[in-house]
Amino acid sequence: MKFTHFFVALILSRFLQVISLKHWIERIADELKERDVEEHVVASGTSISGSIHIGNSCDVFIASSIAKSLKKDGFKSRTVWIADDHDPLRKVPYPLPESYEKYLGVPYSMIPCPEGCCESFVEHFQRPFLEALERFRIGVEHYSGARMYTEGLYNDYIRTSLERAPEIREIFNRFRDRPLRDDWLPYNPICEKCGRVNTTEAYDFSGDTVRYRCECGFDGEMDIKSGLGKLTWRVEWAARWKILGVTCEPFGKDHAASGGSYDVSSIISEEIFDYPAPYPVPYEWITLRGEAMSKSRGVFFTPGQWLEIGPPESLNYFIFRSKPMKHKDFNPDMPFLDLMDQFDRTERIYYGMEDAASEKEEQKLRNIYRVSMIEEFDLPLRPSYRFMTVACQIAGDDPERLYDILRRNSQLPEELMDLELDQLTDKQLEQLNERIENVKNWLRLYAPEFVKFQVQEELPDVELSEPQLKFLQDVADLMESREMSAEELHDEMYSILRRHGLKPQKAFQAIYRVLIGKKMGPRAASFLLSLERDFVIRRLRLEA
C-alpha cells in the first residue's frame, strides 16, 4: 500500500511539474481541450471610441495566441474580433475638435470621418489597427456590431429578450441595490429624431415593434428588424456568444468584477439563451507611464506606434511575460531600453546563444518567447537594441559603417563575424534594417536628450584638470598599442583612472567632453571602439 501511495504521489508530482513548465496561454488551451466542442471560437471585442491602443486591444493578442496554441496541438480553432461600433459615443476622443460633442450618444457607425479620409468615424480608427494586426500575423474573422444588427443576426435574440424581459430583469436585480422598473425592457432603440441610442428607453412592444421615449422629448416606435437599436450590453454579450459559438473570451478586469458583466451575461446566456458561458480570461489594464490610458485625454499607445520602435514579437513579449491579471505599465521613454534588453536576452536564451541563470529561468523564458514568436525562423539578426542607439548615432545613414561598428564590438552572431554586409541573406538584411529603423524612430520620438549625441568634428573648447588630461593621454597610448575588446578596454581604463586618482565620473566625463561636448554619453569603452581608431587617438591627445 505504501508503494502504491508513493507511485501515485510521484506520478502526480511529475504531472504537476509538466503543467508548471507550460506558459499560461498553453495551460488555458489545455483546459479548453477538455470541452466537448467541434471547434473552438476565441473571441475578442473592442469599442471603436477612438484610437485602438495596446490597453484595450490586449484581448485580441491573447485570443489569437490561445487559438494558435490549440491549432498547434491539432484542435480546430479560430479567432473572431468584434468591432463594437454600434455603441454610443460617450466622450470626444483626442484629437477631435469640440464640435464633435454634437455626436455624443450617437452610435459610432453613424458618425462621419473626422478628417474626411475614410467612409466613417469607425473606419478612420479601425483601419490603422487592422493594418497593424497584419504585421503581428494575427488573422481574425472581423465582425461589425452594427452590421450584425442590420443583417438580422440579433433578431431572434431581441425577440427572446423582449418576451422574457421579466426573467432578465430579475437576473439584473440580483446584482442591483435599486431594482429596475417593471416596464424596463433590455433594448435601446436609436431615436428617430436626435439619433442617440443612450438616451432612449423602450417601455412596450408588440411583435417586432418597440415603443420608446427619448430624453430629447421624442416618443416613437421602431421595428427591431431595421437594425436601428441594440440590446442592453450584458444581454447583447450573451447573445453574441451563442451567435458566434464562442468558447473562450479574454476581457478587461472591469467585466470580471463580482456581479459585473461576465457574471450577469453568463447567467443570461445559460438561463435565457441555453448556451454555456465561454471560458473567461480576465486581464489587468496596461497603464502608460503610470497613468490610465484614455482616448479622450490622448493618453494611449497604439500597436502601430509600437511597431515604429520595436519588432512585433516585443509587444507579444511585453503582454505574455507575466500573467494576465498582473499589472503592466508601459513607458516608451528610457525604460523601453530596459524592456528591449530583457527581450533581446530572452531571444538569445531561446536560441541557445546565452545561458540563463538556472534551468527554471531558462524554461520560463523559452516558454514566454515561444508564445511571443510571430513565425519560426533561425536566430534573428537583431543586435542589442541599447547598443544600436549608440551605433546608429555614430554611423548616421551609412549602413557599411554601422555593420563595421557592430562587428568590431562583437554585436553580431559568431557565424556572421567574417561576412560582409552584402553577404547577408535577404531575411537577415530585412531583420537588421527593421532594427535600424526601430532604433532611429525611438531616438527621434522618445529618447531623452542625454541619450542623444553628435561626435564633434572639431575639438570642443573644454577645460580639463591635469589628472583628466593624463588619463586621456594614457587611454590614447593604450588604444594605439594594441587591439582589444570592449571589456578589456573597460578594465584597462579603470586601472588608468585609479592610477591617476580619478573618480570614474570625472574620468569618463573627460572622454565625453572632448568627443561630443557633453558631460554624459554612452558606455565609454564600446563608444571608443565604435569610432575610427586614429580619430579617437588624436582627439584624446587633443590633437584634432
Curated annotation (Swiss-Prot):
Signal peptide limits: none
Record flagged with keyword Ligase: yes
Short sequence motif named 'HIGH' region, residue ranges: 48-56
The enzyme's E.C. designation: 6.1.1.6
GO annotation (BP), single: lysyl-tRNA aminoacylation
Binding-site list for ATP: 295
Key words of the record: Aminoacyl-tRNA synthetase, ATP-binding, Cytoplasm, Ligase, Nucleotide-binding, Protein biosynthesis
Highest taxon above the source species: Archaea
Short sequence motif 'KMSKS' region: positions: 292-296
CC per GO annotation: cytoplasm
Protein's UniProt keywords contain Nucleotide-binding: yes
HAMAP family: Lys_tRNA_synth_class1
Name the UniProt record assigns to this protein: Lysine--tRNA ligase
Organism listed in the record: Methanothermobacter thermautotrophicus (strain ATCC 29096 / DSM 1053 / JCM 10044 / NBRC 100330 / Delta H)
Organism lineage: Archaea, Methanobacteriati, Methanobacteriota, Methanomada group, Methanobacteria
